[in-house]
A protein has these predicted regions:
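Residues forming the flavin
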Residues: 1-18, 25-521
Length: 521
C-alpha cells in the first residue's frame, strides 16, 4: 500500500495551512459565497481550484486498479444486520425455526458491545455467550454468517445492498480472491439490529488529537490492548462512560471523571468511589489545551442553569474521553421509508411505522438495557421466521446480570467564559463549529435542510453520525423550538463509504461496454 498525507504542506509536522487557525474569524460558514464574487473571469480558473484544494479531499489515483472485485446476488428468508446482543438473539431464534438466515456484521468479530461490556448472560461473560451462539449458528446449514460486511443501502421491495471486505486483511491471497464483493440481497423479512453510536459533548478545541469517544477508548483497551492515554479525563453526562474509567483503573491508570450532573448515588458512582476514582460533579471541560496533542484541559464547575461557571481551573491530561449519551443508528430504517419519531426519554430519533418488511430492534430502537435488547431479539426473530416457516420453537430467554444506569443529563454543549472564543466543533469531518450554526440562523436559514447545506453540517461521508443530534439541539435552543419541530435531515445510501471498484465489479476494461464486431472483422 502506498499512502500519502493530504491537506497539509509541506508536511503534517509543519503545516503552513495551520495559519488559518489564527484567521478563523475571516472563514465562517458560507464565506466563499460572499468573498469570491468578482471578477467573474476568476470563478473557474482561480477561485474554484483554490476552494477545492482547501477542502482537504484526497486525490484519486491515475494508476490502474489491479485488484479483483465481484458482485453476488442472494435470497433469504431473514436478513439480520448487526451481530450485537439483539442481532445474535434474533438470528438464533429464526434459525431454530428453520428460516434461511443471513447475519451481517461490519466488524471482524461478532458480538458488538458484548465484547466490551462487563455483563453476565447465563453465568457467562458477554463475550463467551456471543461466541457460544456464533459457534451454534456455524453448525446450521440454513445460516450464512458474514463478518467484515456492511449493509449500506435499503431499497424498494426489501432489496438490501451489502459491501463485503473479502481480501483486504489477507497478507497472502490467491490472485482469484477478490478484494471486495458487493451483495444484492432480497429478503422476505429484515431485522435492523444496527445498535447505537455514542455522541460527543461539544467544548472548546474538541478536535485536538487526544479527544476521543469514551466507548472508543474502552474498546481500544479491551479488544486491542491499547491505552489511549495515561492521564485521562472522562467527560460525561451519563453513567456508561464510568465503565471506561473502570477499565483504565484495571490497567493501573488513574482517571478523573467530570460528570455534568449534580452529585448522585447510582450503582456506577458507588463503584467508582469504592475504586478510589476521583469524581467531580457538575463539572465539564471548557477547552482542551495543546497543539499537536492534548496536554491539559481547562475545566469548570457549572452553575445550576449550566450557562456559566462558579469556578474554573486547569489540570494536566493527555486524553479526554467524551460521552454525551447514545444515538440509535436509524440510517437503514430511514432509507426503507420509515418515518422517524423523537423519543424524549433518550433525546434521539427512533423508527416509527415500518413501510417495508423490516423491524428495528435493540439499541437501534432506543432500548439500552441488555435484558431488553436480548428479549426483543428472541421475540422478533421468532415471530418473523414463524410466519415464513410455520414453525415456532420455544426459546429460553437467558438470565442477564447488568449494571443499572441512572438518567442521563440533557446537556450537549459547554458554555464559554467571557472573552474566550475557541472553536467548538459540532461536525468534526466538515469542521462545522457552533459559531457556523449561529451564523446560518442569524442570516435567515430556518429549515434544518437549509442549515445543513449552508454549513455542510452532516454532509461528510459519515452523514453526521456523531454530529446531527448535537446540531439539532443547538438549532432548537437558538430558535426556542423543540427538536421534533426542527426535524431531522435525510439519510441516504451508502451508509458508509465504499470503493468505486466494488460498485463496478467485473465491468471493467473491455467488459465495461460490449463491442460488437462487424462482419468485416
Amino acid at each position: 500500500m502506498s499512502a500519502t498525507s493530504q491537506n497539509c504542506w509541506p508536511s503534517v509536522e509543519f503545516d503552513i495551512g495551520a495559519i488559518n487557525n489564527f484567521l478563523k474569524r475571516f472563514f465562517p460558514a458560507g464565506f466563499y459565497y460572499k468573498t469570491f464574487m468578482w471578477p467573474k473571469s476568476f470563478w473557474y480558473k482561480v477561485y474554484e481550484p483554490f476552494i477545492r484544494k482547501a477542502a482537504g479531499l484526497g486525490v484519486a489515483s491515475l494508476e490502474k486498479d489491479k485488484e479483483r472485485y465481484e458482485h453476488k446476488f442472494e435470497y433469504c428468508d431473514l436478513l439480520v444486520t448487526g451481530s450485537g446482543p439483539s442481532g445474535l438473539a434474533s438470528a438464533y431464534a429464526a434459525a431454530k425455526n428453520g428460516a434461511k438466515v443471513i447475519l451481517a456484521e461490519d466488524k471482524p468479530r461478532y458480538g458488538g458491545t458484548l465484547l466490551t461490556d462487563d455483563v453476565s448472560i447465563d453465568n457467562m461473560s458477554g463475550k463467551d455467550w456471543s461466541e457460544k451462539i456464533i459457534s451454534e449458528l456455524k453448525t446450521m446449514p440454513n445460516v450464512t454468517l458474514k463478518n467484515r460486511s456492511q449493509v449500506f443501502g435499503y431499497y424498494d421491495h426489501n432489496m438490501m445492498v451489502m459491501f463485503e471486505r473479502v481480501g483486504d486483511h489477507l497478507s497472502n491471497k490467491s490472485k482469484y480472491t477478490p478484494r471486495q464483493r458487493l451483495w444484492y440481497i432480497r429478503a422476505k423479512e429484515t431485522i435492523l439490529s444496527t445498535g447505537s453510536i455514542e455522541r460527543p459533548i461539544v467544548f472548546g478545541n474538541n478536535d485536538t488529537p487526544g479527544v476521543v469517544l469514551s466507548s472508543a477508548a474502552k474498546e481500544y483497551m479491551k479488544v486491542y490492548g491499547v491505552l489511549v492515554g495515561r492521564k485521562p479525563i472522562i467527560f460525561t453526562n451519563n453513567d456508561s462512560a464510568y465503565e471506561t474509567a473502570f477499565e483504565f483503573k484495571k490497567n493501573n491508570v488513574e482517571p478523573i471523571i467530570l460528570d455534568t450532573r449534580e452529585e448522585h448515588d447510582s450503582e456506577v458512582v458507588q463503584e467508582a468511589k469504592n475504586k478510589g476514582i476521583q469524581i467531580k460533579f457538575s463539572y465539564g471541560v471548557i477547552v482542551a489545551n495543546g497543539y499537536k496533542k492534548v496536554k491539559s484541559a481547562k475545566i469548570g464547575k457549572l452553575t445550576k442553569d449550566k450557562k456559566s461557571f462558579e469556578s474554573t481551573e486547569t489540570i494536566n491530561c493527555d486524553c479526554i474521553c467524551v460521552s454525551g449519551f447514545w444515538t440509535p443508528t436509524v440510517h437503514l430504517a430511514s432509507q426503507s421509508g420509515n418515518k422517524l419519531k423523537f423519543d424524549e426519554k433518550i433525546d434521539a430519533f427512533i423508527p416509527d411505522k415500518s413501510k417495508q418488511n423490516e423491524k428495528t430492534i435493540g439499541a437501534a430502537n432506543g432500548s439500552f438495557t441488555l435484558q431488553e435488547t436480548i428479549e426483543s431479539g428472541f421475540k422478533t426473530g421468532s415471530e418473523l421466521s414463524s410466519k415464513i416457516t410455520d414453525k415456532n420453537n420455544e426459546n429460553k430467554i437467558p438470565t442477564v446480570t447488568e449494571t443499572k444506569y441512572s438518567v442521563h443529563d440533557k446537556f450537549w454543549c459547554m458554555p464559554l467564559p467571557k472573552n474566550e472564543n475557541p472553536k467548538r466543533f459540532v461536525d468534526f469531518q466538515n469542521d462545522v463549529a457552533v459559531s457556523d450554526i449561529e451564523i446560518a440562523l442569524r442570516e435567515g436559514y430556518r429549515s434544518i435542510e437549509h442549515v445543513k447545506r449552508y454549513t455542510t453540517l452532516g454532509m461528510a461521508t459519515d452523514q453526521g453520525r456523531t454530529s446531527n443530534l448535537n446540531g439539532l439541539q443547538m438549532v432548537s435552543n437558538i430558535e426556542n423550538k423543540i427538536v421534533p419541530e426542527v426535524g431531522h435531515t435525510t439519510f441516504r445510501p451508502p451508509f458508509t463509504p465504499i470503493t468505486i471498484g466494488t460498485i463496478v465489479g467485473r465491468e471493467v476494461g473491455i467488459c465495461l461496454l460490449y463491442t460488437s464486431p462487424s462482419p468485416r472483422d
